[in-house]
């Protein structure tokens, strides 16, 4: 890392004034998407469903570069943090990442973007924010109005109804007089172009939302280590919806800090590049969210661009090694049947999230993904409807025989739950928005 003015001397007022002038001047420089990339790695774009927007295959997610997860007045935001956010956005645009995504729930992210976005060429931007559904549509209206004021734009391209994670939240959204009707009023007024939803829900809830045919796009989780939502992606394609993949590198396995086992299995690609290539090799997927905290966070992802046309050559040997490692570690019978007959947390004594815990056991056993598995396991009990259910720490209190009656592994699973808790249990983890 390079430091300007390293030493014990404070910068003079003249230096500070000059630096401020340079920062201001840079904000008016034109931006040419992909101008910073050699021709072999130019950004690629895909039609974003019925919106017909030309969506870059990578999007700039806005939940890691902001000053705070809590709302804060603009004047409380440190200049250094704001400069880093603006440099991150400018780097995104330089490499052709024209989709800037944020949410009302991301603390100061919106208000900080609102300092920069009005100074950028609006026609080169796709701006998305997200607002959570409320029981009272007027609360939703006020929150949406605040989002638009924060961003300081005449319109946004995409509004996501944020976190349709349960049937109740879906009902708040689509019922007569609900939050979607409020969003439609903003749309008719020209302040919103397209409306979609984001979700961490079980697949069946996502399918219910898609089948309403009320949404132009969906933000969901799907990546190599968790492909459960593929039926939802197929449904989105049938409805000509845009498909945005949430957090493929973080929730997709902490791929910025992978275990050596995963590194070896994914060679010659890095686990992050492999996962990007895996996702984007499916044309039904339109864009992957990159939660950049600094300008350099895009660099490794950009390596996938010249590889997209070689996906059918590069992926099969890596996929074969990963599958063989899982077979060797877990056995064919377990791999083919472990999901069968598992109860949802709400149908399990103590609300233990048996499917998630066994999934983490598999990742830990097959790929040595200990850090990722620990982080996800210790979020259980703290994640609310974003990551529901409880750990297995007090499993001795509960009789699981009835809820596991349909599982072919009913006798084995309680022991695995105890073992997984022993290996993964530890300090409580909170969602980023609670930190």
Q: What feature does the model see in each segment?
A:
Residues 120, 124-138, 162:
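Structural motif corresponding to the early beta-alpha repeats
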Residues 9-12, 19, 26, 32-35:
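Short, low-complexity intrinsically disordered segments enriched in A/P/G/S/L with frequent Arg
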Residues 69-77, 90, 135-233, 237-249, ...:
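Glycine/proline-rich, positively charged
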Residues 38-125, 413-435:
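N-terminal binding-site loop/beta-alpha segment at the start of enzyme catalytic domains
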Residues 231-435:
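Structured C-terminal cap/extension of enzyme domains
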Residues 59-63, 101-103, 128-130, 159-162, ...:
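A cross-family glycoside hydrolase active-site/sugar-binding cleft signature
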Residues 48, 60, 100, 113, ...:
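Conserved, mostly hydrophobic/aromatic
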